[in-house]
């Protein structure tokens, strides 16, 4: 029997030998470290596979393993774009307390608005919204729901790994699916969102194709392209940040940011537009406006007192990890 190696060396094996040794031609500088074969009396069978592992030594003789092997044909399925989100991340990645994300490490947990205050306990996880969300303090049964901006930040509470799979055939209208019922479905028209982003930007900063690709890929919950941190990037995300959050994609966070900043704004025919003051009071004049009274809040918020925008920026910049792509 003759075995041909990639480098062209021809190894001869006499039929009388019992796989205890292997002799190669004198000109060869390579040798075999092991051969595994199944015991089959018929030729040309797939099960008679020979596994060749070349040794890096200069020895001309190498032992051969006689352990039989079984060749099993694996069923192949088309590759799916999916992401497995660990239920509990190692503490070296993000701060954890009793298996939950320690949000108190990143922002002030005292939130006040209209004489309403709710304290996020140290290490208490934020929860997905429920049907009985209110505008006042929650009851005991709904104690984990944080009011105002925090009540709509979705997080996973499952104890098993969560796999999210979505289709790329129609990214604008595709809806992510998950084996975790607590994961929120798509909740915004992204073409409208992108147009709103363009309207918000001034002449020196517009949403380009790279940014649109970033949003579309985030919508599909894939590891997308993070825009460079330059004039074309108003997302508050550095170039080195990862593109997914624990249980929440940046696109969903951006959706909530958009909803909280502009969801209650109503521009009527009388041009009676409210002046928005976030924290430092920094606001931006719309590009298409001719009056200084037509303003909207600058994305990302103002100074240190910005409650909504700064929290979302902290969320985007801090709660990141590298997901595993199957």
From Swiss-Prot:
Source domain of life: Eukaryota
Coiled-coil segments on the chain, per record: none
UniProt keyword terms in alphabetical order: Virulence
Record bears the keyword Calcium: no
Keyword check for Lipid metabolism: no
Stretches the record annotates as Disordered: 19-91, 112-137, 161-184, 222-245, 276-326
Record function comment: Virulence factor involved in pathogen-host interaction. Modulates host pro-inflammatory cytokine interleukin-1 beta (IL1B) expression.
Induction description: Expression is induced during infection and decreased by benomyl treatment.
Deletion phenotype: Leads to strong defects in host cell damage in a model of human oral epithelial cells. Exhibits reduced survival following co-incubation with a human macrophage cell line and causes more severe kidney pathology following intravenous murine infection. Also leads to higher levels of interleukin-1 beta (IL1B), following incubation with murine macrophages.
Name of this protein: Virulence factor CaO19.6688
Biased composition (Low complexity): 21-42, 53-78, 117-137
